């Protein structure tokens, strides 16, 4: 059975392992190196594990094993209000297709509502149709495509 729950200190090793996998996977995709930048599992976990702040780290379990994670933050919108932003959602390859990602996204929606967010954003890298389709299945709609040109 799949389950999403808030991450606890005992999950740190699993979260570090999952973030290492997520960073490698993202960096290998088109546009991924710009997204990943100099992020490491340590720097990301430091940012996402401050109790009381407008950020939440959840883990996804399957049969009692942590196989996925999701980080969501409440960010202020220019016109007022808050948006829940999915900063990371990753499920181990072998555990995909059993509902862990869906459970994590639903937990992010619940957390965002509790923080007063009125909408949510999530990123999908160019060409990452699997992520785009999963997000659309969870009720997200594409609304903006950002293109970039390096000036060096």
Model-derived features: positions:
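Conserved GNAT-fold acetyl-CoA-binding loop/helix
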Residues: 20-46
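Conserved GNAT acetyl-CoA-binding A-motif
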Residues: 112-124
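Conserved acetyl-CoA pyrophosphate-binding loop and the N-cap/start of the following alpha-helix
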Residues: 95, 99-107
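Conserved beta-strand-loop-alpha-helix junction that forms the acyl-donor binding cleft
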Residues: 93-96, 121-131, 148-150
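Conserved N-terminal entry element of GNAT/NAT acetyltransferase domains
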Residues: 1-13, 17, 21, 30
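Conserved active-site alpha-helix within GNAT-family acetyltransferase domains
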Residues: 102, 114, 126-144
């Amino acid at each position: 059975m799949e389950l999403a729950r808030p991450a606890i200190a005992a999950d740190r090793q699993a979260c570090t392992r999952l973030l290492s996998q997520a960073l490698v996977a993202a960096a290998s995709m088109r546009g991924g190196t710009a997204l990943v930048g100099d992020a490491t599992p340590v720097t990301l976990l430091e940012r996402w594990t401050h109790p009381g702040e407008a950020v939440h780290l959840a883990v996804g379990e399957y049969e009692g094993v942590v196989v996925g994670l999701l980080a969501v933050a409440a960010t202020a919108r220019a016109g007022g209000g808050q948006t829940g932003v999915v900063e990371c959602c990753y499920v181990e390859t072998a555990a995909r297709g059993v509902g862990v990602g869906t459970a994590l996204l639903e937990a992010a929606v619940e957390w965002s509502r509790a923080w007063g967010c009125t909408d949510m954003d999530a990123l999908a890298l160019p060409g990452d149709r699997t992520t785009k389709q999963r997000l659309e299945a969870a009720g997200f709609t594409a609304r903006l495509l950002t293109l970039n040109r390096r000036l060096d």
